Regions:
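Zinc-dependent deaminase
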Residues: 7-11, 17-43, 91, 104-181
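Short, basic and Ser/Thr-rich N-terminal targeting/leader segments
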Residues: 44-48, 94
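Short beta-strand scaffold segments in enzyme catalytic cores
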Residues: 48-56
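A short acidic/small-residue loop/turn micro-motif
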Residues: 66-68
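Helix-adjacent hinge/juxtasegments
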Residues: 73-74, 78-113
């Protein structure tokens, strides 16, 4: 396994790089997570999507629903984890990989640890709240009894472009409303 460090150019963040032996599968499943993000966008939610895979099959899908449900915990990862637990009839999601378009926040990273997900793959880095390497890494806290493996930056530009376009549109709509008042 090859590893080194690099500086993520947009944020000046030092990240660990290692060879991803699952890249083809990771790209395939991240495209499925992007489809979920587009569902969120279609209902005017922040476009974040998630799929959970076990034995090369999607067992759960989720996308952001905070505005729709008015629930602060209705993040894509939480929605998918709840569905996966129900489908497998267990809270232990051992042997599962979670794919999400944006780096998990503290709440979602905690839920991933608590549900014993084996591996996490995310697309876009979150410089304001990412807790799997950008702001901090909850997966590497030694006192925790579970430490998921993780890969970052898979289809990063596609995932971050979805978010950038969404928020650009929101800002434009806000400007248009303030001009018309």
């Amino acid at each position: 396994m090859c590893s080194s460090f690099f500086i993520y150019k947009d944020f000046g963040i030092k990240l660990r790089w290692k060879e991803n032996l699952h890249m083809d599968k990771d790209i395939h499943w991240m495209k499925e997570a992007i489809k979920q993000a587009k569902k969120a966008e279609s209902i005017d939610e922040v476009p974040i999507g998630c799929v959970i895979v076990k034995e090369d099959k999607i067992i759960a899908r989720g996308y952001n629903k905070r505005e729709t449900t008015q629930q602060s915990i209705a993040h894509a990862e939480i929605m998918a984890i709840q569905k996966a637990c129900k489908k497998l009839n267990t809270w232990r999601l051992e042997g599962c990989t979670l794919y999400v378009t944006l780096e998990p926040c503290p709440m979602c990273a905690g839920a991933i640890v608590q549900s014993r997900i084996e591996r996490v793959v995310y697309g876009a880095f979150d410089p304001k709240g990412g807790c799997v390497g950008t702001c901090m890494n909850l997966f590497e806290i030694q006192q925790f009894n579970h430490h998921p493996q993780f890969e970052s930056g898979v289809l990063e530009s596609e995932c971050s472009d979805l978010l950038k376009k969404f928020f650009k549109k929101k800002r434009m709509n806000k400007k248009q409303k303030s001009v018309s008042i």
